[in-house]
Amino acid sequence: MSINTEEEFIGMQKVSDVVAVVLRKMKSYTKIGMTTKELDDYGGELLTSFGAKSAPKHTYEFPGFTCISLNHEIAHGIPSDKKVLKEGDLINIDVSAELNGFWSDNGTSFIVGRDIHGHKRLVDSSRNILIDRISSIRPGMKISDFGKSIERQAKSNGLKVIKNLAGHGVGRSLHEDPEYILNCEDKSNNSRFKLNSVVAIEMFISTKSSYATELNDGWTLVGNNGGYVAQHEHTILITKTKPIILTSANEI
């Protein structure tokens, strides 16, 4: 969406604060021995307490309030009472919601307990690339050039990107134009970032895989070549200078 009034800005900031706080609290709530279903139920309770609706459940009938992906899962992981969190697990929580007609989206990957499997470099790289690349966005920048810069930075860290997952426009629905803000160059995409537009910027930084494939459950995405992926995501407002990070309350 494009924000043209103070009321629209306030609406977007409110829903962004909600998803950001829910994400931050879910991260703090995460404990060894907990199931991902318990964690998701907690997230659902928080969303309800704010008067917000889970975006994936409301829009796509996703079987969970939030997407919780574990270890080799990249995205859209289904919360389950059979998935018990263990020391060193790589977990990703993605929280998106609707409040008063406005939608926002954010996510983070982190390590459960101690980093016994050496995931810290991947997680830190994903987070740092997100913040660094967001700060570079200006109106008129080609989205393809932005994606190219993400992949370049990932490669400089000895890592890859997932090339068929993307950030997207957001605001009056969960997914809006621009539909594909990829983590790589797409020469066929001539679209540019627009002043006052709201977009969700997502990193999908990978150790081995370059593409996501869907499991038989119809939701869960994994890498085509194994390995691990870290995802970090903010919803931002593009301004004449540095973008405003609407979901900054998640503290990722």
Residue ranges and their predicted role:
Residues M1-I252:
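Active-site neighborhoods and metal-handling regions in enzymes and metal-associated proteins
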